[in-house]
Amino acid sequence: MGGTHTRYALTTEWVLAAPVGRIFDLLTAPEDWPRWWRYVESVVTVRQGDAAGVGAVRRYTWTSRLPYRLTFAMETTAVVRPVAIEGTARGELSGTGRWDLRELPRGTCVQYTWQVTTGKAWMNLLAPMLAPVFEWNHDQVMAEGGRGMARHLGVPLLAFRGTSLRRHQAVSSRGES
């Protein structure tokens, strides 16, 4: 069991009534996230990156609605101002994360794609039963991030969509046809 890891493909979308540049600036300053994102316990810079931030390594500690925390290091691997930020995680979560920002007539669509495996043995052991709960928990953390960003920017969060919500909607639509 020591080599078993559970894979997750998680996608979150926020739509905020703010220009893409303001959102991009917040996302590229993760050391400030604990001030506005409730479940970000700490972000510590381990290594500085280049002028764009590529090569930076930060250690994140996250809490959640469930009674556990996750810690991992994230290296920024690509930055395309002001539309994309990509990184590689290693630690209790390993994989890739990518922020994509798209300007809309009424604001900005922010999409986060998180392709990770879990490194905690207990999570992997319980994943066959609890994976939907872990996905729900991820959605709760991300929903709070969208609300926190909106509060911090002083703008409305116009929409939120997460992985477990989409899965639930897909099941519901099949049942109604």
Language model features by range: what are they?
Residues T88-E144, F160:
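Beta-strand/loop substructures that line and gate deep hydrophobic ligand-binding cavities in soluble
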Residues A17, V79-R81, L104-R106:
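Structural motif
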Residues A9, V15, E75, D100, ...:
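Conserved beta-strand segments that form the floor/walls of ligand-binding pockets within enzyme
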Residues T28, T71, N124-L125:
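Generic recognition of short, well-ordered alpha-helical segments
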